[in-house]
Amino acid sequence: MAQPGPAPQPDVSLQQRVAELEKINAEFLRAQQQLEQEFNQKRAKFKELYLAKEEDLKRQNAVLQAAQDDLGHLRTQLWEAQAEMENIKAIATVSENTKQEAIDEVKRQWREEVASLQAIMKETVRDYEHQFHLRLEQERAQWAQYRESAEREIADLRRRLSEGQEEENLENEMKKAQEDAEKLRSVVMPMEKEIAALKDKLTEAEDKIKELEASKVKELNHYLEAEKSCRTDLEMYVAVLNTQKSVLQEDAEKLRKELHEVCHLLEQERQQHNQLKHTWQKANDQFLESQRLLMRDMQRMEIVLTSEQLRQVEELKKKDQEEDEQQRVNKRKDNKKTDTEEEVKIPVVCALTQEESSTPLSNEEEHLDSTHGSVHSLDADLMLPSGDPFSKSDNDMFKDGLRRAQSTDSLGTSSSLQSKALGYNYKAKSAGNLDESDFGPLVGADSVSENFDTVSLGSLQMPSGFMLTKDQERAIKAMTPEQEETASLLSSVTQGMESAYVSPSGYRLVSETEWNLLQKEVHNAGNKLGRRCDMCSNYEKQLQGIQIQEAETRDQVKKLQLMLRQANDQLEKTMKEKQELEDFLKQSAEDSSHQISALVLRAQASEVLLEELQQSFSQAKRDVQEQMAVLMQSREQVSEELVRLQKDNDSLQGKHSLHVSLQLAEDFILPDTVEVLRELVLKYRENIVHVRTAADHMEEKLKAEILFLKEQIQAEQCLKENLEETLQLEIENCKEEIASISSLKAELERIKVEKGQLESTLREKSQQLESLQEMKVNLEEQLKKETAAKATVEQLMFEEKNKAQRLQTELDVSEQVQRDFVKLSQTLQVQLERIRQADSLERIRAILNDTKLTDINQLPET
């Protein structure tokens, strides 16, 4: 009866729980609707963004396509411009050749004409000098005869005078004087005629010289004009050469970049090669460890064998030797051609080293034969002939190593191992033209592994350049736990055998089956020992491939260096041609500039002289004008001073008369007393003294000024006369100089006009060149802009793709969240339905306990 009482409480709690779940479900539904709305909005926004980005990408692609079309058009224009430049270059070369030929022809004609004219002038001058000297000699002889006759006549006259015949002497003297006058006329008249003729010839010669100089100047002017006309072509050719130089420099830069890339690849190959060397060294250590273990096992088996078993082993060895010899002969016949080719490739130094290495091998093995007679039959096949030092195959080498391992002496064959290893090392060097130091201890270790034929690895002598590391020596010399166990077992067995009965020689200590099994194991061990591991062969193949790649890389580097050298040679050749052309252009320009500069200097000198004369004339004129102005000013001052003095005098006279009249007009009252009169007299006297001193001072001052002005006027008058005379002379000189300079001015104006024309043509050509360069720079800038725009478009596309991927991931996440909400709402609806259908509280509790809302992944699928 007590149970029905509390039953309504679970119902109330259950109803509350249901109400809460319904509220939660309603909230979830509202959240779901809100999320669906947000998702639809975001989806619409994403769609709009996607469409907008697609339109932007299409527009950018259209812009990029247009830019590429423009770039192609610009490239075609650039190619056309380059073709035009090539044509201009050809035209320039042809014009240069024709111009040079014409210049040489003109120079040759001018030199011939000048030489002929100089010869004619020299001949005429020489003839004139000879005739003149002859006439002078004749005249001297005539005058000497005339002087002698005159002296004789004078002596005769003196004698006659002494005799007193004065009248007759006078008549005779008159007659003789007339005769002398006639003789003088007869001599002087032809002389005057000859002098006039010589003057005429001299004027004609001077006229010819002037004509020749004028023709020479005309030819030089013509040559100068031709040089000026060709200068533009030369400048165009120089511009073409500059463009070629820039193109060649760009090619050289490209080749340098390619060479740098090849060097970088070569460095990467070297790093890979070093890594391969490291792995090879590890494999080599592993192989040496296995070899050491096999050798220890061989030694232990050899200790166990009896003398009969050793004899049988010797017989088997002899059979193997015969088979090996037969195989060796067959291989020698088959590989004869390849061996001859290899011997041709191997250097002489390698052959000498192989012969030297074979000699100590034979000596060492003879020493072994003399010391250890029991193993003579085993060591006899190791003496290699000097003509075929590399004829053994790898299998033969490992068989020999097996036989060496079965001998009693472990120290006798280290020199043979060294010589074989050296021989293989030299062969490797000759094959790849590489030094052993390029590969380190790896190649030496490989040669040792291929030619291993000794027992004691502790006494092993490696080839030059190879040294075992401490870890390798420790790994070779150390014993494994299994080896220690076998060594202890063998030591116990040998001690038991020493204490036990020793069987006579020829009897076996083991059975036949055990012996056969032992022989098989030995044979298998020998085969395993002679067979190379797959890892080593793979490493060797990789090493060969790397060597081939390195050789190809070196060949490529050599080719690139050759191409770079050819490009540099071509660049130097073009630079040399350009330098020669520039030198010729400079020489021609210097010649023309020298001629122009000479004329310009003359014109400048005349202009300077004219300017100096004008300046001196203007300076003298200014000085005279200044002096005249000073004189006029001083004159005006003197006249003003004179007027002022006259006015002062007049004013003083007027003032005096005025004062007198005033005094007379005033009612002058005489003093009454003597004292007052005395004071008045003293006062007047003082005033009179003051007036007199002032008048004296003024008079002296005026006299001094008048004298100074008179002297100044006289000096200025003299200076004026001197200046007028000097200025008159300078004016006359200036007129003469102006008359001489006017012609030079006209010539200078003509030269300036020609120079201006040349400068204008040069300026036009330079402007054309600058326009072409600007066009080239604009094209390059446009190309750079287009490439930059392309890069930016690609970057933008990449960013848009990333953005689209990010939006896609967000969309996927939102879809997953929506699915989770849907899943959760469905689960809650199912649970509510199950709760509604539940018939008891325990069932509801079980349903609620089974429901786990901590993880969405744990919800069951509905």
UniProtKB/Swiss-Prot annotation:
Stretches the record annotates as Disordered: 315-374
Protein's cellular compartments: Cytoplasm; Early endosome; Recycling endosome; Cytoplasmic vesicle
GO MF annotations, alphabetized: growth factor activity; GTPase activator activity; protein domain specific binding; protein homodimerization activity
Predominant localisation class: cytoplasm
Subunit record text: Heterodimer with RABGEF1. The heterodimer binds RAB4A and RAB5A that have been activated by GTP-binding. Interacts with TSC2. Interacts with GGA1 (via GAE domain), GGA2 (via GAE domain) and GGA3 (via GAE domain). Interacts with AP1G1 (via GAE domain). Interacts with AP1G2 (via GAE domain). Interacts with ECPAS. Interacts with KCNH1. Interacts with PKD1 (via C-terminal domain) and GGA1; the interactions recruit PKD1:PKD2 complex to GGA1 and ARL3 at trans-Golgi network. Interacts with KCNH1.
Function: Rab effector protein acting as linker between gamma-adaptin, RAB4A and RAB5A. Involved in endocytic membrane fusion and membrane trafficking of recycling endosomes. Involved in KCNH1 channels trafficking to and from the cell membrane. Stimulates RABGEF1 mediated nucleotide exchange on RAB5A. Mediates the traffic of PKD1:PKD2 complex from the endoplasmic reticulum through the Golgi to the cilium.
Name of the protein this chain belongs to: Rab GTPase-binding effector protein 1
Species: Mus musculus (Mouse)
Organism placement in taxonomy: Eukaryota, Metazoa, Chordata, Craniata, Vertebrata
Gene that specifies this protein: Rabep1
